[in-house]
Amino acid sequence: VAQFYAEHNEKPFFADLAAFMTSDVVVGMELVAPDAVQKWRQVIGPTNTATARAEAPSSVRASFGTDQTKNAVHGADSLGSYKREAGFWFGGEDPAARPMQTTAVLDNCTLCLIKPHIQREGKTGQVIDAILAAGFEISAMELFNLTRPVIEEFYEVYKGVLPEYLPLIENMSNCPVVALEGRQANAGASFR
């Protein structure tokens, strides 16, 4: 936290910020769009939630923030900040070289793949809400672009058995797929 929020280390609110940011799991996302930093800053609203409620009442911080520290989301304030922050969270292409390690527990869990068509339809959040409503804990989640050979190997047991095998492979190849670990007692059986 001290490294990520280095510009705030000497400020009076830093201890509260550090305590809050390390109190539970944090989800990191890289959002991609033309002028993404500026667009995201507009969506999230002012840092101070009282100001956000007054000046940007439909913003994320006005809707979900409770105070200046617990203001729901973080957003880079410049392209330079974005580059530094993305490097901090996501590192490079090699998962082993990433500064943040997985939160996967690999116990009482099952794998869920949110397929590309769900993402294209903008329903990823609804699927995640349904998983949580069913009593599962989501202990790890990551977005992957899977190649055809990887998808074919993953679904190999269904080749020649599942009539929709080839369309499934086509749909899942070279598209973003959200993989998540869902945890619950007897997760494999209860997830189905």
Residues of each region from the PLM?
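Non-catalytic terminal and connector segments of soluble metabolic enzymes
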Residues: 1-192
